[in-house]
Every structure is written in C-alpha cells, then in structure tokens.
From Swiss-Prot:
Gene3D superfamilies: P-loop containing nucleotide triphosphate hydrolases. PANTHER family: POLYPHOSPHATE:AMP PHOSPHOTRANSFERASE (PTHR34383:SF3), POLYPHOSPHATE:AMP PHOSPHOTRANSFERASE-RELATED (PTHR34383). It holds the Pfam family PPK2. This is Uncharacterized protein in chlN 3'region. InterPro entries: P-loop_NTPase, PPK2-related. SUPFAM superfamilies: P-loop containing nucleoside triphosphate hydrolases.
C-alpha cells in the first residue's frame, strides 16, 4: 500500500508544481531527549498542559519505528520539484531561522513583482481618485 501512496503523493505534488504552486516540505527533527524535555515541561507547567496527550508518551515507545517510517517517506517522496527539508529542531531559534531562510530564498528565486498597470487602467484610477476626492 505504501508504494501506491508514495506515487500518489509524488503525482499530486508534481501536479501542483506544474500548475504554478511551489511545494516546500519541512520535517522539524526533534531528538528523543529534547522531545522528552518538552513533554515533561508540558506536564509540569500548567499553562502547557493542553499541549500534552497521554498518547504522546505511549507513542514514544515506537520511536525507532517512526524514524524508519520517516526515512522511508523522505526517500520516496523527496523529489527535485518538491524536496524535503529536514531541519534540526532541538533549538527553536535555529529551526525558525533555517525555515525562514529557505522560505525567503525560495521567494527571492521567484522574482515576484507587482503587475504593471496599463495607461488605460492608470487613467481609470485617476478618474476614480477624482471622484473619491470630490466627495463631501
């Protein structure tokens, strides 16, 4: 079933790219030790209790299987048109910086600009401006 899913994901992402969508995929890679620290903070700090689910602790028992599954996903769905960016996430400041840098670089590479306005449209805008400014 997974091979079929991987192909579907790749085809969907290729479709998006062919239709002008930029696909950026980030995996925020938190170490097992850091995850434990964050879970304990969520339990110990009442204002963070809402972030913790008992199932989080149970699922940690399957850490190695999750890591293998993630690796399988990355190997099968990272493509030239929709790559995965695996970002170390133990230090939030670094994670935010790395993700922001990739987004900014991608946006710059698109060479985006505002649409140009034709002379006819510019005249219409000036006329609309006169109408608005003449209101009482």
């Amino acid at each position: 079933i997974w091979d079929k899913r991987f192909k579907q994901i790749n085809h969907f992402e290729q479709y998006l790219v062919e239709n002008g969508i930029v696909v950026l995929k980030f995996f925020l890679n938190v170490s097992k030790e850091q995850q434990k620290k964050r879970f304990l903070a969520r339990i110990n700090e009442p204002e963070k209790n809402w972030k913790f689910s008992v199932s989080d602790a149970k699922e940690r028992q399957h850490w190695d299987q999750y890591m293998e599954a993630f690796e399988d996903v990355f190997n099968n769905t990272s493509t030239s048109y929709a790559p995965w960016y695996i970002i170390p996430a133990d230090h939030k400041w670094f994670t935010r910086l790395a993700v922001s840098d990739i987004i900014v670089s991608t946006l710059k590479s698109l060479h985006l600009s505002y649409p140009t306005v034709s002379e006819v449209r510019r005249a219409e805008l000036l006329e609309a401006k006169k109408v608005l400014e003449s209101e009482e």
